[in-house]
């Protein structure tokens, strides 16, 4: 029997490129409702929206979602997740999945996969997903986070830089992906053991996390194991810009 898990969807109103992003309309529904709908299709026993904004809270209550108003001063999404897990009274060995509030096309199967992977790997406190990189432009794009793992699928590191750097191959040609190097893009969905979250918050950011702006590096810095599996379904891009929003509107608007 699969271990039960809770989905938490962080949703902040502030956004540099798209203010009020969670409330942007997509084919008659606010974006946060679209994300909530996808999460509800997963095997999660509970789906909770975590927001620091009264407008988002009211919208969620309007379409029947369970939602919590959190503190506004959290340093990261994981810090916000810890507050929610504590307020919900989740057991230390419970699993919580963090689904980003700007992923209205997230496949429910990936939510189930990342939760099941964590349950199957007791040596890890976090599980996440990745997919192959097929274009050299993605490898050199700092917005595409790369991940390298060991033989057991545990993360060695994450970086916005090309990882690993194929020295000899790139000395000859930087316009093609080197053969024999399994480059992978990190997909930003996480499952956590609740007991780990308090440690994560207590540690505070480390210099490596700050340099890359990747909070998962805080866990690796402290020796925490992160299991990384290849996603079973394609993860369609989320919404970061007005152009992304129009693309998703076309997909969901028919």
Swiss-Prot record:
Pathway: Nucleotide-sugar biosynthesis; CMP-3-deoxy-D-manno-octulosonate biosynthesis; CMP-3-deoxy-D-manno-octulosonate from 3-deoxy-D-manno-octulosonate and CTP: step 1/1; Bacterial outer membrane biogenesis; lipopolysaccharide biosynthesis. Keywords: Cytoplasm, Lipopolysaccharide biosynthesis, Nucleotidyltransferase, Transferase. It is found in: Cytoplasm. GO terms for cellular component: cytosol. The keyword Nucleotidyltransferase applies. The keyword Transferase applies. It is an enzyme of class 2 (transferase). One of its GO terms (molecular function) is 3-deoxy-manno-octulosonate cytidylyltransferase activity. Its EC number is 2.7.7.38. One of its GO terms (biological process) is CMP-keto-3-deoxy-D-manno-octulosonic acid biosynthetic process. Gene3D superfamilies: Spore Coat Polysaccharide Biosynthesis Protein SpsA, Chain A. It catalyses: 3-deoxy-alpha-D-manno-oct-2-ulosonate + CTP = CMP-3-deoxy-beta-D-manno-octulosonate + diphosphate. It holds the Pfam family CTP_transf_3. It comes from the Bacteria. Belongs to the KdsB family. This is 3-deoxy-manno-octulosonate cytidylyltransferase. It comes from Pseudomonas aeruginosa (strain ATCC 15692 / DSM 22644 / CIP 104116 / JCM 14847 / LMG 12228 / 1C / PRS 101 / PAO1). The lineage of its organism: Bacteria, Pseudomonadati, Pseudomonadota, Gammaproteobacteria, Pseudomonadales. The gene is kdsB.
């Amino acid at each position: 029997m699969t271990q039960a898990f809770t989905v938490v969807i962080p949703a902040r109103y502030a956004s540099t490129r798209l203010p009020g992003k969670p409330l942007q309309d997509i084919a008659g529904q606010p974006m946060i409702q679209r994300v909530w709908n996808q999460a509800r299709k997963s095997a999660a026993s509970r789906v909770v929206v975590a927001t620091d904004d009264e407008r988002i809270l009211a919208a969620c209550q309007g379409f029947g979602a369970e939602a919590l108003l959190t503190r506004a001063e959290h340093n990261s999404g994981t810090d916000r997740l810890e507050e929610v897990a504590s307020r919900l009274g989740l057991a230390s060995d419970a699993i919580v999945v963090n689904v980003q509030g700007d992923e209205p096309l997230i496949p429910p199967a990936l939510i189930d996969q990342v939760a099941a992977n964590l349950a199957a790997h007791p040596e890890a406190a976090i599980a996440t997903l990745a997919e192959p990189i097929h274009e050299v432009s993605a490898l050199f794009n700092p917005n595409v986070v790369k991940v390298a793992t060991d033989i057991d699928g545990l993360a060695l590191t994450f970086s916005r830089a090309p990882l690993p750097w194929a020295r000899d191959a790139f000395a000859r040609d930087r316009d093609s992906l080197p053969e024999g190097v399994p480059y992978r893009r990190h997909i930003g969905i996480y499952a956590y053991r609740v007991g780990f979250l308090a440690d994560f918050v207590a540690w505070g950011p480390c210099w490596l996390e700050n340099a890359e702006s990747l909070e998962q590096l805080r866990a690796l810095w402290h020796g925490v194991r992160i299991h990384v599996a290849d996603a079973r379904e394609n993860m369609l891009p989320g919404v970061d810009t007005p152009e992304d929003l129009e693309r998703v509107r076309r997909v969901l608007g028919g």
